Amino acid sequence: MKIKEVRITGFRSYKDNTNVSGFSPRSNVVVGRNGSGKSNFFHAIQFVLSDEYAHLKEEQRLGLLHESTGPKVAHARVEITFDNSEKRLMAFENSEVKIVRQVGKKKDQYYIDNKMVPRAEVVNLMESAGFSRSNPYYIVKQGKINELATSPDAYKLKLLREVAGTRVYDERKEESLKILKETKMKTEKIQGLLKYIDERLQTLENEKEDLKEYQKLDKTKRSVEYTMYDNTNKEAIKEKTKLDEQKVELNQKDNNVKSQLNDVIAEMAKLKTDKKKLESLGRGLREDKETLQAEETKMVEEKMTLKLEIDSLNEENTRERQGRQNAEHSLQGVGDEIFKNEEELDTIKPEYAKLLEEESRLKTDIRIDESRAKEILAKQGQRSQFSSVDDRDKFLRNEIRRISGLIADNKEREETIQKELADVEREDEKLNNEIQSISRTIDENRYEMDTFAAKSTSLKQEYDAAYVAQQTAAREEKAIRDKIGNTEQDISAANDQLRRIVARPVYNGITGVRKVIEEFKHDNRNGQHDDVINGYYGTVIELAEVPDMFRTAVEVIAQNRLFYHVVETDRIATKILRKFNEMQLPGEINFFPMNRVSAPRQRDLSNNSNARPMSDVIDYEVQYDKVFKSITANVIIVRTLDQAARDLRNEGFDVVSVDGDQMSKKGVMTGGFIDKKRSKLELHTQKDRFTKELAELQKSLAEAEKMVRERTQEAEKIRNRMQQHENQIGDFHRKHRELTEAKNAISQQFYMVTSTKEPKKDQLLGIKNHLRELLAQKENFEQEIGSNMSSQLTSDEEQTVKKLRKKVDEMTKQLATVSRRRMDLMHRKNAIENLLTKKLYKTKESLTARVDDISDNERRHKLENANAQLTSLLTRMESTRKQLATAISELQDYETKEKALQINIDNVLEQQRDLEKQQADFQLQYDKITAKEDEVKQKREDSLKKLILSRYSIKTRKNQFSYEISDSEEVGAKREPIEHRKLKISTFCLEYRAKLEKVHSNMRLLGALPTDTFSKWQNVKPRELEKKLLECVNELKKYENVNKKALDQYMTASSQKEELTKRMAEQKKSEDSIEELLKVLENRKYEAIDLTFKQVKKNFEQVFKQLVPHGRGKMQMRAREQRDDEEGINSVELYEGISVLVSFVSDDGDSETREMTQLSGGQKSLVALAIIFSIQKCDPAPFYLFDEIDAALDAQHRKSVADMIQSLSDQAQFVTTTFRPELLATAEKFYGVRFRNKVSHIDSVTREQAYDFVEDDTTHG
């Protein structure tokens, strides 16, 4: 038997389900850092198997539960799977056996193969597999090695005793001593009882003679008592007959009054119901009135608010209209002024451009001519400047190249500016087109906005009409709901009354069957319960309709059968009953299975106009004919139980009157007053009527709700359309503002683009003139190349200079004229442009925005909406006022009806008081009769008291007879209601019957009487009988202490003596057996201790030799000297302890034998391990758990321990924890424990990973 798998959940540091599987059947090692949870893994196994965790208190169980962040763990569970292939667990045939222990705050449970078992069964199972409770060393925890290594010799002896199993012997010895003590106590008691019985037998022998004389007197006394009881019986019968006659007479009178009173009370109940309904109607009318008044008040407030808003909007529109007209007038003037200035500007601009061009041309020509003159004059100094013609030409070519570069640059600039001007023209045209497009869009948007505004007003009117229709439908729905509430109250009241008059089990049964049918309907998948659902028809009372006048008679005959359940077959009844019991429902249910019901044959009724078969007065469907005829078979209904009814009874019919009086064909007549207010059929009829009314009202409510939904949806649709229109209008407004803003922005951009054209044209003109200068200069340089150099100008050159200077002077004069004219035009042009751009254009934009502002449209739209709302509000106010007038009128009608109803109630109350006065008169008569009854009762009880006193004077018979004497009620006591008085008379008659029965009982208690009792004492007067009874009593006083059971007691005592004698012998035999068992147990204990010591001693020498090959060890038993007073005791009792002597061969060859106290810590641990291995070999277990047993050993000894475990693993499984690498070398399976986030995790690892664990722990240790 080996550990195959361990599952840990919620135990200490293990939170989630931790599965440790794949254990080797030989050697397994668990490694991990200190505090990671290795020991908790061992504790989990101990938790299941060890006695250390056997009995845990609540706080100890809670201490085992995992504690960390996150949800709290509810329980700790450890499951160990054992390999049972060797069948060491013989009680199980499976190859695997699972043992589970689970603890929580309240529970501690064990399971074997998922079956809950007590702990004792788990313990017995482990013992059967080879685990001894006397040898706890198959689990060695941390510290156990050190504890054993440092323990004294006496502790080792105690350990040896446990291993030998002496605790079992001691427990059995203790149990045997306890049984022996109890046996001796029982023997002493039996001896005392025997002594008492002997004395009692002697006393009973003397009491026999007194008993005979006593029995003679007792017979005479009982004969006299019987005669007195017989006389009392006859008097009671006479009194009962008289009282019965009085009771019948009073009942007849009272029943008539009560019947009238019931009619009055029923009328009062009807009136109260009508009043209740009327009050409910009144509450509804008042609520409607208050609601309509509140609506009217609210509408008046809305009307005032709307009028104020309309007035305010009218004033704003007037102001805005005047402002707009002023803006339009101003816009016209500004437009004319702009037109005039633009016209003038258009006239100035061409002339200004022409002058500007002329001015620029003249300036350029002047510069060209001046430059030409300077160049000609410069030829005079060429000889001083240049050394040769080539130098000059070289200079000129360089200048030509420079000028050519400038020409190219200026041409490029010219092209760029021309391109920019073309772009500006295009942008100008584009912006102008956009302005025109936006203007058209603004006009279209304004048109759409006006159109939607008109539609919005129309939708508002539609919404008002829909709203009024919705409110009307809602009021109709509320009225129907009020009616439903009243009807449900009526049904609830009928159910409450029916619950009070129907027996609780029957009513619970009806409710339970309804739940069962609903359950069948709920679970009716694929029609599997259709037979039950369709085969259950309801209760009898639900299937019948009975006219009012016959309901009492039918109810008297049917009784609880009215609530029997009618089903198609008995199989369906069985299914319903089975489901009823499965659901554990309370109550009583009875069935009429139609396939089992058989109706008796209905005999023909002779001609009798006043009699009808009961089956003829009940209305039901034909399919239920057998059910109703089985209830009403051969039952005839008549008006009264007259002679005709007696004739029908003689013909074999059961007869019942319409008032409920019955006459059975067997001769039994029953009847009396029946409270029709408690009629089950009447209540059920009312409930059925109310239920039908409720169904109709609910149908009407569904239609009303549908109408409300439709009206609400219609109003909601219109409101949504209104909202959409409002949103659309808002979008139009927003779009208008956006378009206006866009138009203004583009206009600004247009003005900015336009303003850039003139500078660019001026710049272009300057570039062109500069090009002319450069071209002229280049041409001059080109002409000069190759010419001769001279110090003087030629005549042509001089003439050219003169012409050029003259031309320059003329052009200068012309330039002055042109410049002056251009400056004048420029000033005028700038003034006009400034006026237009800085004032007139902005004023026009402002006025245009004012004219085009849609706020007027918005206000107009608001005004139209407000006017439409006011119109709608006035319409709704008119409708509300009409409804309010109607409600006030209806409320006045209600108040009139309420007054009339109150008058009727007062009249009925007066009738009720008159009838109650008649009942009070009857009550006086009942009081007189009751007083007379009390007198008769008192006389009779006085005579009984005398008789009882005479009988109780004999103490020996005080337990043989008993009388129940009631205290007389005071005559003229507090007057009770008439119903209580009637009940009291009936009770009085019942008491007389009870008294008669008591007399008969007492006469029977007298036992067998002498044969002459009737003839001897029958004619004796009562006084003489009392005198004779008193004489007998006085004579019996002499024997008041006589033992009437002396003979029986003598026989019983003799039998008891014989039985006690036998038991005495058995107890003696038991004492001898127990003493013999104690001796055997003591001897076996001593033998077990000796045998165990020898085995452990031998094993220790072998194990120590294996662990320390060059050393030796032995164990010795130490015993104290025997004292003189201990002669005869076993030598084992003299043992004081076990000493251990070992020798280790040191490096210097020292092999001295030493005791445990002389060894080092590591040597002590090794010796302790040798002792444990020796004990385990003496009492081997299937597996062992070692927790860090090598902690204190050096490397050599750890290697020896590892080899020892490897050799022992052939016969047993080992699971060890360690911090050292030696145990890893010989192990077959390795497990690593990690601790993350306060939770331990254990996984299977390789040998190399296990070495890493050990090295990591050594590094961090």
Curated annotation (Swiss-Prot):
Location of the motif DA-box: 1159-1193
Pfam annotation, one family: SMC_N
Location in or out of the cell: Nucleus; Chromosome
Domain (SMC hinge): residue spans on this chain: 534-645
Protein's organism: Caenorhabditis elegans
Subunit and interaction comment: Component of the cohesin complex, composed of the smc-1 and smc-3 heterodimer attached via their SMC hinge domain, scc-1 which links them, and scc-3. Interacts with scc-1, smc-1 and tim-1.
Cysteine disulfide partners in this protein: none
Cross-referenced PANTHER family: STRUCTURAL MAINTENANCE OF CHROMOSOMES PROTEIN 3
GO MF annotations in UniProt: ATP binding; ATP hydrolysis activity; double-stranded DNA binding
Membership in a protein family: Belongs to the SMC family. SMC3 subfamily.
SUPFAM superfamilies: P-loop containing nucleoside triphosphate hydrolases, Sec2 N-terminal region, Smc hinge domain
The entry's keywords: Cell cycle, Cell division, Chromosome, Coiled coil, DNA damage, DNA repair, Mitosis, Nucleus
Protein name, UniProt field: Structural maintenance of chromosomes protein 3
Role summary: Involved in chromosome cohesion during cell cycle and in DNA repair. Involved in the repair of double strand breaks during mitosis and meiosis. Required for chromosome segregation during mitosis. Central component of cohesin complex. The cohesin complex is required for the cohesion of sister chromatids after DNA replication. The cohesin complex apparently forms a large proteinaceous ring within which sister chromatids can be trapped. At anaphase, the complex is cleaved and dissociates from chromatin, allowing sister chromatids to segregate.
Effects seen without this gene: RNAi-mediated knock-down is embryonic lethal and results in aberrant chromosome segregation during mitosis. RNAi-mediated knockdown at 20 degrees Celsius results in the mis-localization of lab-1 in germ line nuclei.
UniProt GO cellular component terms: chromatin; cohesin complex; MIS12/MIND type complex; mitotic cohesin complex; nucleus
InterPro entries recorded: P-loop_NTPase, RecF/RecN/SMC_N, SMC, SMC3_ABC_euk, SMC_hinge, SMC_hinge_sf
SMART domains in UniProt: SMC_hinge
GO biological process: cell division; DNA repair; establishment of mitotic sister chromatid cohesion; mitotic sister chromatid cohesion
Coiled coil: 188-332, 406-450, 677-826, 857-930, 1023-1085
